[in-house]
Curated annotation (Swiss-Prot):
Biological process according to GO: DNA topological change
Gene: topA
Site (Interaction with DNA) location in chain: H31, R136, R137, D140, Y145, W152, R283, R467
Domain Toprim: 1-110
Protein name as annotated: DNA topoisomerase 1
Keywords from the named record: DNA-binding, Isomerase, Magnesium, Metal-binding, Topoisomerase
Family: Belongs to the type IA topoisomerase family.
Function: Releases the supercoiling and torsional tension of DNA, which is introduced during the DNA replication and transcription, by transiently cleaving and rejoining one strand of the DNA duplex. Introduces a single-strand break via transesterification at a target site in duplex DNA. The scissile phosphodiester is attacked by the catalytic tyrosine of the enzyme, resulting in the formation of a DNA-(5'-phosphotyrosyl)-enzyme intermediate and the expulsion of a 3'-OH DNA strand. The free DNA strand then undergoes passage around the unbroken strand, thus removing DNA supercoils.
Cited Pfam families: Topoisom_bac, Toprim
Keyword Aminoacyl-tRNA synthetase on entry: no
Catalytic reaction equation(s): ATP-independent breakage of single-stranded DNA, followed by passage and rejoining
Species name: Aquifex aeolicus (strain VF5)
Amino acid sequence: MELFIVESPTKAKTIQKFLGKGFLVKATLGHVKDLPEKELGVDLRTLKAKYVYKRGKKKLVEQLKKLSRRSSIVYLGTDPDREGEAIAYFLKKDLEKVNKNIKRAVFYEITPEAIRESIRNAGDVNMNLVYAQFARRILDRLIGYLISPILWKEFKNYKLSAGRVQSPALRLIVEREREIQNFKVKKYYYVKALLRKGSEEFWAIYDYRYENPSDAKIIAKKLEKGYFSVYKVEKKKEKVSPPKPFITSDLQSEANAKFGFSSERTQKLAQELYEKGYITYPRTDSYRMNEKKAKEFMNYIEKKYGKEYVGRLRRFREKATAQGAHECIRPTSLREEIPEREELRLLYDLIFRRTIASLMKEMLLEREKVTVEAITPELKHPVYLVAKGLKIVFDGWSRVYPSEITEEKLPELYEGDLLDLVKTTLEERKTQPPPRYTEGTLIKTLEKLGIGRPSTYATIVKTLKERGYVEVKKKALVPTEIAFQVVEFLMERFPTLMDYKFTAQMEEKLDLVEEGKLNWKSVVYEFMEKIFGKELEMVR
C-alpha cells in the first residue's frame, strides 16, 4: 500500500478517485502543529520556537504513523505554498520515525495527470518555503503577543489587535475616510446644446468649465440665436486588449464587484473548486498559463465562435514575487458547467469565461469626435462644441466576458452639414471625493503597494470586521471611531509597523527567504529591532 496525505477531506476524496486501489489518501484537516495558544512560544534571543500539536492532531498523527508503518512509501501532497510546505515538514518529522521512505508530491491542479506526475517527480520538502513560513508565523505571533496587549490596556477593549498586514490596511481605510471628511464639494457647469440632423438628435458640449452658473447661462442664452454646422469629423480606430486571466487578487476583486462576495468567501469557494478538481491552485500571483491548456482553450474558441475570435497566448511581465511554477487561476478542463451549488457555479463560470476571454481577439472600436461650429451675432467669435460617438466594430473577447464599454451613437455627420438647434441647457456637475474602499479595491491597493500576498488577502478584511475596526455599508468599508483612535495610537507608538514601504520590504524579504537568498532569522531580527526598538529589551 502507498499512503498519500493531503489537508482536506474533499481533496482526499478527489485524489482517491484518481489513484484507486493500492493507494490510501488521508487528510490532516489543516495544520498539525502551531505555536501554543496561551504563551508566546518563541525565545526572543534564539528564535527557537515551541511548536505543539493542535487540538486533536496528536491522535491523528498517531493514526497516520500506524498507516505509514504499513505503507511502502508515503507521499505528502499538501498545498504548494509556505503553509502547505510547513504541514509537510512537521508530518515528515513525525512519520519518518516509522518510515524513512517519505516524499513530497507537488501539484498545482487536481487532475489524474497532475497527481500522477507529482508522484513520478516526488522529491524532498522545500526547506526554504518552510523557513519563510517560520518567519511569517513568528513575526505575526510577536505582533499579536507584544502589541495587542498594549492596545487592550490603552483602550480597555480586549477585541482589539494589531497585525503586520492588518494594521497598514486599517491605516489605508482610515486615511481614505479622512480625505472624504475633509473634501469640499464644488459645483461647476457646462453648456450643452441638443442638436438635430434630419430626424436624429444628439448632444454637443461646450468644453469650458464654468464655476459660476450665471456666466454659463449668458453663453447658453446667446447660443439660442446661433447657426450650427459640422466643422470637423475625426474617426479613430482603437483596439481593446482582452483581460488577463485571473490571479488571486483579481478574482477576489471581481467577485466582490460582480456578486458582492467577501474576499474570504471567494477564497473558500475557489479552494473548494480546486479541491474538487475544477480549477488550478487559487493562491497565485502569476499570470502564466500552461501552453498545452491554452491551445485546448483556443481550439474551443475556434469551434464555438469562429477563427476570427481566436487570439494568442500572451506573455505578461511577472511580478518579482510571482512563483515560477504557479499558473494563473484557470479551469482544469473545457467543462462549461459544473454540477454544484449556485455559489460554486457562479464563481466557476466567472473563471471559465475570464480564461477563455484572455485568449480571444481584441475588441475593435471606432471613436468619433465631431466639432460643431456655432456662429451667433451675440458673440464676436465662433463657439466650438464637441460631440463624441463610439461604435463597436468587432466585439472580440467581450462576446464571452461582458465589457463596460457601451456604444454612443451619433447621426451620420459630414463636414459642412447644417444642424438645427433644439435647445441649450446647463449641465451641473460636482467634484467627487475619493471613493471608500471596497474589499476588492482594498486588495488591489495592497497588492499595488506590495503589502500582503495571495494567501493573506482573504483574511485581512475578515479580521478588521471581527475586531470592530470596520463596518461594511453598501459594499464600502467604513472605519469605526475606535479605528481612528487605534491608527493614531499605532502611528505614534509603532510608526514602522504602520509604514507601507517597510511592510512591503518585509514581504519582499520573506520572498527572498523562500528563494533561499536570505536567512529567515536575520529577517525576523531586523523586523523586531525596527518595530520594537528599545521596547524589545523590556519584553526580553
